[in-house]
């Protein structure tokens, strides 16, 4: 069922028009708001993730974790932010000022731009474009340039090695990740992120793509971990080898951009996994079935609003399951070597993702009803 949902742009522009503004003026006032909403939502998500990482890491090591800044340490992300904002922004004497400054921006900006096309609920997304998946892949591919610029512009051998590792790792795993996503696109017959979720909403949990794309799902998770530089793929900033990798010479707000970009990238990958494979805002049981159990008509406004609100929570719960797993893996798996990492990407994941794509195409021709023909 397609619920009425929440259309932020339509609601905002309609409210302004009711106050007497022309449609053009109302639309002009809306244009800067998506970027602001995107930054606020992603920043809040990063704050929650940093607190979760500290508490889960503490539990894994039988520690208490942060407990001084607010109840259960919930204000520790704000304290971290204030600390980073007040630190001096140092420019090394031998660093290239242009590359050194642009690097963090090119690492941070593409991640936040990707949030423009990620649906958090029915009609609750900032920009619903027909090529949403293509936009995600194309925008995220800019990040390796920023990593290289940061490593090279620092004029530090550890930073350079970290930047080269990060770029090689990102490029190696972008291909299998893109091919695994392409298999989902093939089944949904479109690049629209909202359409992909709606294609999974027919039979509840049985309609989710994870059952039809188990191989692609595993490839996506492994590639996403490598793209976000999480353990066991955190080679670009391996402390024992490279101090802090391409971040070695950074401090203050520039370092904060790397910090924000890293966690925002993990949350983005988790949201994309929830949207592509776990049905996004779709419920485990279809809304029609729930309405029949409760004896409520489908056009009931309370059902519409409740389904929309709970759908947003459903998307976030699914996404934070992946965040939780990524944090647990940090204390479970050892770091791999650089040759093992590249071999896994080029010699195993890439061929398997090609086979998975061809298999999906064949199954779509053979079983069009089940595979989205």
UniProtKB/Swiss-Prot annotation:
Enzyme nomenclature, EC number: 7.1.1.-
Keyword Translocase: yes
Recorded topology in the membrane: Multi-pass membrane protein
Keywords for this protein: Membrane, NAD, NADP, Plastoquinone, Quinone, Thylakoid, Translocase, Transmembrane, Transmembrane helix
InterPro entries registered for this protein in UniProt: NADH_UbQ_OxRdtase_su1/FPO, NADH_UbQ_OxRdtase_su1_CS
GO BP term, pick one: aerobic respiration
Protein name stated in the entry: NAD(P)H-quinone oxidoreductase subunit 1
Organism: Synechococcus sp. (strain JA-3-3Ab) (Cyanobacteria bacterium Yellowstone A-Prime)
């Amino acid at each position: 069922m397609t619920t009425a949902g929440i259309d932020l742009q339509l609601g905002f522009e309609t409210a302004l028009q009711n106050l007497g503004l022309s449609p053009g003026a109302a639309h002009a006032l809306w244009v800067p708001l998506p970027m602001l909403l995107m930054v606020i939502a992603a920043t809040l998500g990063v704050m929650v993730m940093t607190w979760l990482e500290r508490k889960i890491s503490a539990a894994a090591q039988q520690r208490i974790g942060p407990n001084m800044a607010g109840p259960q340490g919930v204000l520790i992300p704000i304290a971290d932010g204030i600390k980073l904002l007040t630190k001096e922004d140092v420019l090394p004497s031998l660093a290239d000022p242009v590359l050194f400054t642009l690097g963090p921006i090119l690492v941070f900006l593409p991640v936040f731009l990707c949030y423009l096309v990620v649906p958090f609920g029915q009609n609750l997304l900032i920009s619903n474009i027909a090529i949403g998946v293509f936009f995600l892949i194309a925008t995220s591919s800019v990040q390796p340039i920023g990593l290289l610029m940061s490593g090279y512009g620092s004029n530090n051998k550890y930073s350079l090695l970290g930047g080269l590792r990060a770029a090689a790792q990102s490029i190696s795993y972008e291909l299998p990740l893109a091919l695994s996503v392409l298999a989902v696109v093939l089944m949904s017959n479109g690049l629209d992120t909202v359409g992909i979720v709606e294609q999974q909403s027919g039979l509840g949990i049985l309609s989710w793509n994870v059952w039809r794309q188990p191989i692609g799902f595993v490839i996506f998770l492994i590639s996403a971990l490598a793209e976000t530089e999480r353990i066991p793929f955190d080679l670009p900033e391996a402390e024992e080898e490279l101090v802090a990798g391409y971040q070695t010479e950074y401090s203050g707000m520039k370092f904060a951009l790397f910090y924000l970009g890293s966690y925002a990238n993990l949350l983005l990958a988790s949201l994309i996994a929830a949207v592509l494979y776990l049905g996004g805002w779709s419920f485990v049981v279809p809304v029609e079935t729930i309405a029949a159990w409760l004896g409520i008509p489908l056009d009931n406004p309370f059902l519409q609003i409740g389904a929309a609100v709970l759908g947003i929570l459903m998307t976030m719960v699914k996404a934070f399951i992946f965040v939780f797993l990524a944090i647990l893996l940090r204390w479970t798996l050892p770091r791999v070597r650089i040759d093992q990492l590249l071999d896994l990407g080029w010699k195993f994941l890439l061929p398997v993702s090609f086979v998975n794509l061809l298999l999906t195409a064949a199954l779509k021709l053979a079983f069009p009803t089940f595979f989205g023909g």
